[in-house]
Regions:
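Short, solvent-exposed loop/turn elements at domain surfaces
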Residues: 14-16, 82, 160-166
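Short beta-strand elements bearing conserved aromatic residues within extracellular beta-rich modules
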Residues: 87-91
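Aromatic-Pro/Gly-enriched surface loop or interdomain linker
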Residues: 137-181
Length: 181
């Protein structure tokens, strides 16, 4: 079985540890390792490497009328990898407390759906291509109540990942795991 040990950061080097705690750096490093392994394996088997696309972005729900909604999202372009372009999307749906279904393939970046009254619908989307399936978007939910006189909008303002707060003084260097940047 082929194996490797990847030494990427030193726990004795504070700048390295700042990177090691950064979720965005962790993702970039993991994706770079994945691409390297993929290219190596494809080269060994004389096949063309197709990199899995990045997760869609700007996922949103627009309420249209009488239980009709439109889900939409944008392709996330991987500027470093032209083969990571999605060829479609998988829309996963869960109703009330049930788990998500196996998904349905959607070729465009939007879809209109009808909601049954008094049920809570949960949606998430993944991008797909010949290389596989991306991570999913965050989960968005919708509820249709025919007697409603107003529409409620809930905005998810959480749009970033953060490392723990950095402590870097003359006396101390480290991280406050109870605070973030």
């Amino acid at each position: 079985i082929p194996s490797a040990i990847l030494e990427t950061l030193s726990h004795q080097n504070f700048p390295d540890m700042r990177l090691g705690h950064d979720p965005n750096f962790k993702f970039a490093l993991a994706r770079a390792v994945y691409k390297s392994i993929l290219r190596f394996m494809c080269n060994q088997h004389r096949t063309v490497a197709t990199v899995t696309p990045l997760a869609p972005s700007y996922f949103h729900i627009n309420y249209l009328y009488n239980g009709q909604i439109k889900l939409g999202w944008r392709e996330t372009n991987d500027e470093l990898e032209p083969t990571a372009k999605p060829t479609g999307y998988i829309l996963y749906t869960a109703v009330d407390s049930a788990g998500f279904d196996n998904g349905r393939l959607v070729k465009q970046n939007e879809i209109e759906l009808s909601l049954h009254p008094y049920s809570t619908y949960h949606f998430k989307v993944a991008a797909v291509n010949g290389g596989g399936e991306s991570f999913t978007t965050e989960t968005l939910s919708a509820y249709y109540q025919p007697e409603a006189t107003n529409t409620i909008l809930v905005v998810d303002g959480f749009d970033r990942l953060s490392s723990p707060a950095v402590i870097d003084t003359q006396q101390l260097q480290g991280f406050d795991l109870n605070e973030d940047l």
